Amino acid sequence: MDGTRTSLDIEEYSDTEVQKNQVLTLEEWQDKWVNGKTAFHQEQGHQLLKKHLDTFLKGKSGLRVFFPLCGKAVEMKWFADRGHSVVGVEISELGIQEFFTEQNLSYSEEPITEIPGTKVFKSSSGNISLYCCSIFDLPRTNIGKFDMIWDRGALVAINPGDRKCYADTMLSLLGKKFQYLLCVLSYDPTKHPGPPFYVPHAEIERLFGKICNIRCLEKVDAFEERHKSWGIDCLFEKLYLLTEK
């Protein structure tokens, strides 16, 4: 994190409606994996999570941790290696297979009986289960409640018109005394159509505020050279902690 600016008083952009009708289909997301357009994947894992992880875990083991739209996030192995049970959901079977291959983990495949035509991939160790299906179909599997959710690249990828349904799905999966770790991006939405989409603080309050205490832990400068192609010159990432009211 050296050289990374941190600020908690960044102004939000006022034109929050400009992206509201943007839509990416599940097929388009699958095509991104097939065509290798996965610049959103972080090979070294998320640095803000790495920074705060031990503080969040507080020495606990055996937690159930959920990864929405997990892709091949290396952070799943971080939690599994610390003795936690990881469940993820990802529409791309290729992304799931790449996770197990790149992490050198053996796995098995089973059909998801509640969702015909879909599969769940389970590590041989038994503590990583990745469901290959739509996030909105997942509640039908009765996967239970979770102690923690790590939402990086999920809420910001959901079509803006589907956010309320997504948030309700996430809230339905949370157990008592949960910790919901949420990363969102702040940039001028008039210059880039998304995804990832711009999610202002007011939207987080609208989606989760009735159930959750919402605290912004950190805002960091996340602008990279590749973001110039988005037509923007400024990009910040914000890490939120949502807890039970």
Swiss-Prot record:
GO CC list: cytoplasm
Modified residues (N6-acetyllysine): 58
Modified residues (Phosphoserine): 14
Binding site for S-adenosyl-L-methionine: 29-40, 69, 90, 134-135, 152
GO MF term (any one): S-adenosyl-L-methionine binding
Name of the protein in its database record: Thiopurine S-methyltransferase
Gene Ontology biological-process annotations: methylation; xenobiotic metabolic process
Species in which this protein is naturally found: Gorilla gorilla gorilla (Western lowland gorilla)
Compartments in which it is found: Cytoplasm
Predominant location category: cytoplasm
Residues of the signal peptide: none
Subunit note: Monomer.
Family note: Belongs to the class I-like SAM-binding methyltransferase superfamily. TPMT family.
Chain residues that bind substrate: 40
A family per Pfam: TPMT
Keywords in alphabetical order: Acetylation, Cytoplasm, Methyltransferase, Phosphoprotein, S-adenosyl-L-methionine, Transferase
EC number from the UniProt entry: 2.1.1.67
Catalytic activity: S-adenosyl-L-methionine + a thiopurine = S-adenosyl-L-homocysteine + a thiopurine S-methylether
PANTHER family hit by this protein: THIOPURINE S-METHYLTRANSFERASE
